[in-house]
Structures are given as structure tokens and as C-alpha cells.
Amino acid sequence: GMDVSRMRENELAQVRNREIGFVFQSFNLLARATARKQVMLPLQYSRNGNRVPPAERRRRAEKALSEVGLADRMEHRPSELSGGQRQRVAIARALVNDPQILMADEPTGNLDSTSGAEIMEILHRLHSEQGMTIVMVTHDQSLADQAERIIHLKDGLIVE
């Protein structure tokens, strides 16, 4: 591990960019950017200030989109995608830097049950096949029950 308590803000930003992927309930996608460009974006800010070359950004973005089942949607903009597909773009964006940890805030909260199940299947696969640590916030007990470990919070404090 690494001691982040003494790091400066720019060092913390680099750690967050390299080691942690973030997935949000509201997707946080850019309206005018294609799925491929959404996923390439984190690579422009990574690797200790050394930008990843454009061809490598493209290759890695395409790989991440393929991993979440969107190889055929790379040129689509968010308005052309379903909610489940938008969340998969967000997951691909979170994965493109090969993080050790994936932080997911209500990743199925804005989705229908079928799309939500597809997202959970992707998260399970990332954990079981790649050994990725996934920290998920949810109010849905049926999703929490799928986790190896559950930590309950109340008013910002651990209660269980």
C-alpha cells in the first residue's frame, strides 16, 4: 500500500487517476462526445504527467468498451444509448487506466432491473476474473447481499 496521508493534492489526484476508477449513478458523460472519446478522456491526464499517445488511448478505450459489451456502440453519443449502455460507457471509462479499485456510487440506481442486473454481472466479472476490489454504495439490500463484505453506515458512521 501507500501512505496517502502526507501527499500533496496533485499527488493525490495522480493516485486517484491511476489507482481508482469511479462510476457514478448519474453516469457523468459529456453530451457531445462519443463513447470512445468518453473512455479516452482519463488517459489524457494519466501517467505522471506523461500523456498516453493517441493511438494507445484509442486502443485501450476500444478494449475497455469491448469488455463491457459495447464494441458496436463506440461512435454513439449518450443521447443515442440506453441507460444501461450509458452506465457501461461510464464503467469502461473507469476501467481504462487499469485501476486497482473501482468505486461505484449507486451504479444501478438509475436503471431498470434488466440493465441493473447486466451492470452487476459486469462488476462480478471484474472482481472474480481480474481480482478488482469493488467498493459499492447502495441502498438496495438485494445488491448489498451479493457482496463479500457489507459495511453499514448511519449518519456517516459505521454501525455494523
Regions found by a protein language model. Give the residues of each.
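ABC family nucleotide-binding domain
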Residues: 1-153
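Conserved switch/coupling elements of ABC/ABC-like ATPase nucleotide-binding domains
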Residues: 155-160
